Amino acid sequence: MKSILRQTLDFLLFSNIFIALCAVAQAMVTYQLLDVEPDKYLLGFLFFATLAMYNFSILLAKPKNPQVSPHRRVRWIFSHYRLTITITIISVFSLIPLALLLSTTSLVLLAFLAFVSVAYNLPIFTIGEKRYGLRNIPGIKLFLIAMTWSLSCVLLPIVELESTELITIPTGDIILLVAKRFLFVAA
């Protein structure tokens, strides 16, 4: 029984399904606070985008010998490499039809968030012979993570609501919601 529970938890946590569900939950909080019906297509997009990006991140950061890593997560991911690749590919392909159901304004915001997320993960700077990404710059990692989560889980649902439901949310309320979520994630 313990073994099955452990394997299930390992799968949910290390495959990044849990973190993708957390992103959906954060967007659901936004809908709840605004007292509106959640957009299932946007929630699906958010789930698969989070799953793809987090898996992409770990696959890019593959250590030389992951099987001897001191971190159980790294050992699990690379001992289930094909599963991780499969989940990532399914996630990416799931984004295509969902993107067609989102507004142009939402897609522009998503393009910005995708750019930030990829730049965060890719080694775009070179110092000596070593390459670094934005995540390696002291102090910016927490800011970028909190910004990406608050924009994708608060601003994105609001932008989509304003584009499709023809409702207007006061700018002050939007800023307050985004700032509160930013601080929540950063805490």
Question: Where are the regions a protein language model picked out?
Answer:
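Functional transmembrane core segments of multi-pass inner-membrane proteins
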Residues: 142-187
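Transmembrane helix-loop-helix
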Residues: 85-127
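Core segments of transmembrane alpha-helices
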Residues: 21-25, 87-94, 144-155
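Interhelical loop and helix-boundary elements at the membrane-water interface
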Residues: 2-19, 64-87, 120-147
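Short, hydrophobic transmembrane alpha-helix segments
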Residues: 28-41, 100-101
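Central hydrophobic cores of alpha-helical transmembrane segments in multi-pass inner-membrane proteins
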Residues: 24-28, 46-59, 92-94, 114-122
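Glycine/small-residue-rich interface belts in oligomeric ring/scaffold proteins
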Residues: 43-75
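Membrane-embedded alpha-helical segments that form the functional core of polytopic membrane enzymes
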Residues: 35-56, 111-116, 168-187
